[in-house]
Amino acid sequence: MKRIVELKERNYADASTHADAPVNYEDAIENYKRILDITGDITANIIAPNSEAVDIEGPHLIDNRMHYASKTLENIQATRQAGLWGVSMPRRYGGLNLPNVVFSMMSELIAAADAGFQNIWSLQSCIDTLYEFGNEEQRQKYIPRICEGEMMSMDLTEPDAGSDLQRVMLKATFDEKENCWRLNGVKRFITNGDSDIHLVLARSEEGTRDGRGLSMFIYDKRNGGVDVRHIEHKLGIHGSPTCELVYKNAKAELCGNVRMGLIKYVMALMNGARLGIAAQSVGLEQEAYNEGLAYAKDRAQFGKKIVNFPAVYDMLSRMKAKLDAGRSLLYQTARYVDIYKALEDIARDQKLTPEERQEMKKYTRLADAFTPLAKGINSEYANQTAYDSISIHGGSGFIMEYKCQRLYRDARIFSIYEGTTQLQVVAAVRYITNGTYLSIMKEMLEGELSCDCMKGLRDRVAKLVQLYEEAVEKVNASENQDVHDFLARRLYNMTADIIGSLLLIEDAAKAPELFKKSAHVFVRMAEEEVIGHTAYIKAFNPEDLEQFKAVEEENEEA
């Protein structure tokens, strides 16, 4: 953390011009703690108590405008008054200059209180993309507004362009007379779609049909030209408005350069959003575990509390182990992102030293490798934990009066939006096949542990790394791309199992009283998965694919 603060604060230069800026590392950490305390107070006393009413009411569509649920407005007002907007932005624009690690902690706290509101609040991170790729005039125009509490959205998806964003057809044409761009078309499934400032992916190049014809634009609601045609009625996250938008010759500004919208800017935007979903997942997972544990301690059957039944404490211990491992993965990823982004920011103002360039290259690679792991596996853990929380509640979990049913409904989208888990596998698979993850695992195995009590457990994980290496070699040896794609999810899960185990072992070595039990449980789970997946992969032959394709053929014959 010390390196992150050092890079973010640049020798604490802001202290001379901003009264709230830290003067040293200790001061910065105290500042982060104060902000987290404020966030925790608001989530506990306002957002969480409002969550049930928000879930019931949801947003409203009136005259082509979206209106938040009344309690959502209370949440927004509370976070505005506390200054919790634009928090990652430099102080010169009105931000708090917080690192991603702290932003992720805030996201986790808010998501535990209400995952739908976390969507609305965390979309402020879209401003990072404008800060990185917009010009200085745009930064000065828009960033202070976000820091004051205005809303953002990223308008990417269309009816015929979901995961395949290169099919986006919303049209951008340059208006020579007004010296601006005009946007026309429809966007669908836009979270917080009636926001104040939108980042919009649109087709600027006439006659193109692939990603190279797409650019990124800034739409300001103050200029008008966009209607909300529909608000989706969803399974969960009811407080988060999901909108269909109609762009009617809407005035917009180009962000960055033409043709770079998808291949560069959206990739940066999505990586930030995926880290946000990882934090959202961990927050909800914590709440689902808390609800399950509290119910198990209170509910008695057959003369004793159900928490004392092996079937129940098995579930609870697995929930806790996934939570602890997933959280460790989240914050390791956030640390990597913080270091490379801080160095990128410094490089805008001055030339980096050769050592700094190498450091940025290293942490960019690590962040790129860890982000799809953190998003994918934590979103899956959130779904599993919410499911198990309902199981612990039994029939009561199926009743709307209990919170666990809402957590279950809210969690379902986590493994879908901002790239399905299958797409996270696609993003991660090259780091599997080229040995990046394997190198990380081996480096972690060689690292010093704070406590010898975890060495035996790490030795067991070392055996899993050997199996993992054999499984990767088996897949790499195949020249059949369908085999690679078919087995990729198993390799991805194995990667998360092993890296999660090693991270949790490091945590347990530092704080055995907090993480030792979870580390033991998680390693057992990892052994169960890695050994099973390795056996499956080693026994798999290309012709086996036909057995799975046959399912579709049988349906056609029927």
Model-derived regions, located:
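Amphipathic, small/basic residue-rich leader segments at the start of a protein or domain
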Residues: 1-117, 141, 345-354, 540-558
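N-terminal leader/propeptide and maturation segments of large enzyme subunits in energy/redox metabolism
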Residues: 2-41, 129-135, 312-330, 336-358, ...
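Alpha-helix capping/hinge segments and adjacent helical runs
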Residues: 83, 155, 237, 361-445, ...
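C-terminal amphipathic alpha-helical interaction region
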Residues: 93, 435, 447-558
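N-terminal glycine-rich flavin-associated loop
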Residues: 118-136, 162
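A short core secondary-structure module
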Residues: 180-226
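A glycine-rich, basic-preceded beta-loop-alpha segment at the flavin cofactor/substrate interface
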Residues: 222-225, 229, 241-273, 290-307, ...
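C-terminal helix-coil-helix/basic helical segment that borders enzyme active sites and/or dimer interfaces
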Residues: 324-375, 472-486, 505-509, 513
